[in-house]
Regions:
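NTP/phosphate- and nucleic-acid-binding module
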Residues: 1-149
Length: 149
């Protein structure tokens, strides 16, 4: 596409430069770069590998069952952690399905509250990326996550 300028006797081809940027493109790029699928035990595990600081939910709290004692400990942990972190308590379905659901929404860490939490005052912390689990005292939870701030 060009035109002829009769005043200068030149053929001109216009150039269009459209610099565009926006939140939508940035967000889409982030989602694409964090999306991952991997094979685990003959099934496909879908997850978002969000950095701890930008994850919509930073720490998922998963009581092993709906027993009142475990829910109470879970709520106490949430009250401690929600001052500095985005947390969510999930009590629906089996623990394995809850782990998968938290992986799919990009939650970097899940805390499992089980009967050892009642007896020994400990919880199991699971890392989304490595799927490794460690047992730590409930009193050490704030210290564990402070390294990500």
């Amino acid at each position: 596409m060009s035109y002829f300028d009769p005043e200068t006797n030149e053929k001109i081809t216009p150039t269009v430069i459209e610099p565009a940027g926006g939140l939508t493109r940035t967000l889409f790029a982030l989602l694409c770069s964090c999306y991952d699928e991997e094979e685990v035990n003959d099934t496909t595990r879908t997850l978002f590998r969000f950095d701890f600081n930008i994850a919509p939910i930073q720490i998922g709290i998963l009581p092993l069952s709906k027993k009142d004692e475990l829910i109470e400990v879970s709520n106490n942990i949430k009250n401690i952690l929600q001052e500095n972190y985005r947390t969510e308590i999930d009590v629906t379905q089996s623990i394995g399905k809850r782990y998968r659901r938290q992986d799919e929404i990009g939650t970097p860490y899940c805390i499992t509250v089980d009967f050892d939490s009642l007896e020994k005052n400990t919880v199991t912390v699971r890392d989304r990326d490595t799927m490794e689990q460690e047992t730590i005292p409930i009193d050490d939870l704030s210290k564990k996550y402070s390294e990500f701030e």
